[in-house]
């Protein structure tokens, strides 16, 4: 059985959307929500890097794709949560206890991912000269 064929940008956008969907569900711990928020932002950043033709390294350290985006002349959206705080969920809190005092709210996680999504969708559309790349994945 064959399905639609997607390019790397589209695959990363699809995977980011899957991680973002977890934030809207119920029953997940704060660590899991933070992890999926971090993963969504990471994949969105890497989708934009792919769109501008930059090969990204496989790392969960969000500062690295951010640095590559800045070097490529791209910007980051202003978000309620800094990348450094999200980064903790990909590494430290996957294997350690998350103190309640450092836990961002679900609202902050959703807003941060949503701002990145909107930013990346807009940039991919502008850079490709067409909404087709984004529309192919948002219609799934």
Question: Language-model segments: what does each one mean?
Answer:
Residues 1-140:
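Terminal alpha-helical segments
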